[in-house]
Amino acid sequence: MEKMNWLSRLASRVPGHRVPQGASLQTPVMADPETCLMVFKNHWSQVVRILERQGSRAAAGGADDLSAVRNHTYQMLTLLAEDRAVPSAPSGPGPLLEFALREDLLSRVLTWQLQWDEFGDGVEERRAEQLKLFEMLVSEARQPLLRHGPVREALLALLDACGRPVPSSPALDEGLVLLLSQLCVCVAREPSLLEFFLQPPPEPGAAPRLLLFSRLVPFVHREGTLGQQARDALLLLMALSDGSPTVGRYIADHSYFCPVLATGLSALYSSLPRKIEVPGDDWHCLRREDWIGVPALALFMSSLEFCNAVIQVAHPLVQKQLVDYIHNGFLVPVMGPALHKTSVEEMIASTAYLELFLRSISEPALLRTFLRFLLLHRHDTHTILDTLVARIGSNSRLCMVSLSLFRTLLNLSCEDVLLQLVLRYLVPCNHVMLSQKPAVRDVDLYGRAADKFLSLIPRCCRHHAPSPPRPEHASWARGGPSREPGRREDITGPGSPSVDSSSVVTVPRPSTPSRLALFLRQQSLGGSESPGPAPRSPGLTASPTSSPGRRPSPAEEPGPFMAVLFAKLENMLQNSVYVNFLLTGLVAQLACHPQPLLRSFLLNTNMVFQPSVKSLLQVLGSVKNKIESFAASQEDFPALLSKAKKYLIARGKLDWAEGPTAGPTPRRSDSLVRSRRPSLGELLLRHAHSPTRARQAVQVLQPGRDGTGLGLGGGSPGASTPVLLPRGGASERQGEALRVKNAVYCAVIFPEFLKELAAISQAHAVTSPFLLDTSEEVSVPPISGFGPLNP
């Protein structure tokens, strides 16, 4: 797994990358080592006189002494930063550094200056000056100063002094973080130096000290540049701790780093907006352009990404402790109650936040703890997952956000998610008749399922144009001539249609184009075309043997997730266009999965289910009948359908022209999520600034909230004959216009969804890993590397 960009962007901050005081800025005295040494000794002699003066603090000239020492120290450290090793001894210290080490210059000056802290006047100002001088020396030195004990001791004394109660100021905090950041960069270049900064316990039984680390922790959740520098420096130390058991144990056992990170996430989450200002009807998730301008959310995301990076590079002890603290200190006490707020707006916000968090983190250990929280944690006797599943059937906005969350969960390709949502209900095979259990592994090699899905396209949505010439590859047979394209096999079996195994069906060439390509290609040709006459709709209602009032037993139910998806799918005519895009995309995502149980449940049109269990084919047949009934009740349905197609095509072309940058930047590695072309629904659900010409084209056709724009009851100038609405109040007219608009868009989306299911069923026939002989043992690799969710 590639390292995150936290480490790479620190390269420009290592010593030597600053613009040096080059020859053009260098005075002649700096170019002469002997002269530099003479000047250096002269400054030191002036300082020594002041240091050795008795009672200087009480003298009237005490302030003058402080100023003189400060000025002389600045000159000496400037010369020391320019010092180089002599050519005869390139590995040894330079002449100025050798003299400073011999005289213990840094510690003596610092000790004298720290004595003035007792008086309490100007302490923060002096401390900021000291930090700035040492930062300049460390960052601009041309020699490895930290290899020498006297230099490290002086730095540790200064860092220890920074822990004393001193009035804080922005300059003091900035100087401290900048010095610590430079020290961490130097230590990262020479990891062996890290343990020199780990001080032994001051007394028996006490914990050791790593001031380089402990002084950075209070700044980890600061906003702005200061917090970013602190997190960058801490991340360097985390990476070093992976190779140092001593430092790793110190961070895990003797520091408050992990509790601070977890409790900081909780505090930052409490400051997030409880209500999200929705930018448009198609909004369903938080993208970077949505949250980057919200300071509270941007700060939280920065801290969450930092936690993800720490778990990625830190010592295993630190990783485990941080994951546990995030689960027990943030997810359970904070996210759990937030997801169960009574206000719908708060539920929408918390669900959108959770989806954003899952989409942003990439480290498997952190993803595992989020999934463990969702799948196993119970809030008021119900798991978080059950609560989220139930919300799919709620109002439009909460439904869209919930569907977006489950789309992200399925994109993780985690077997535990699929098991909890679907497979644990399908594994007993109680949803199928006993005689059908051996057929679960069957693969549709002859395109019968694809033909069945295409036969469900409503007659009112078909373009009755002459059939194109029949290509040679259209007939799929194992031998012998193919049948006439207009012939269809009789449907056998009430409730669960089947096709004679000897039949040969005319189907397109197997392919898996994106939803956008399918939609644009079919609509540009004038609608969906069938290779033969439209087949008669098979009987797709429930089996006559099932009583109307009988509820399916728990053993027969396909699970609450599939039940709520099917219920929402059956009400496609009442859903908004954006809900239908998310809904059909989620069902198609499930259908793409190669697991035989799931594939047979969704795509095997010959499977005979229990009388009380609805199949996807039955649900789609119900939607087809509703669309045809609606089309028969609207005299101008063809004109409305044409307008809706034009709008969706224009919107699709608009978002496709904007390119993939309109969507969120993927953070997950290729091993977890495979890249693919965006679907039509994804493109239409994006928020992006549009080119002027395309924006104007879409605005002409865009449906309004009042039903205008497509001739769906609004009477816009460019619309066709308006729909005759019932007389009554404005709310009734708007409600009827919305109903008509949703139904017309459903009539556009539904055929494309059927074509996609047909393409997916064909793709399974040529890509399924279960095409081996039934006598052979099938070995399927695990879906993901998350491992078990149980702790």
Swiss-Prot record:
Modified residues annotated as Phosphoserine in this record: S467, S524, S537, S543, S547, S679, S716
Keywords in alphabetical order: Phosphoprotein, Protein transport, Transport
Keyword flag Glycoprotein: no
Any Pfam family the entry gives: RAI16-like
SS bonds (residue pairs): none
One record GO biological process: protein localization to perinuclear region of cytoplasm
One Gene Ontology cellular component: FHF complex
PANTHER family the UniProt entry points to: FHF COMPLEX SUBUNIT HOOK-INTERACTING PROTEIN 1B, RAI16 PROTEIN-RELATED
Name under which the protein is recorded: FHF complex subunit HOOK-interacting protein 1B
Organism expressing this protein natively: Rattus norvegicus (Rat)
Gene: Fhip1b
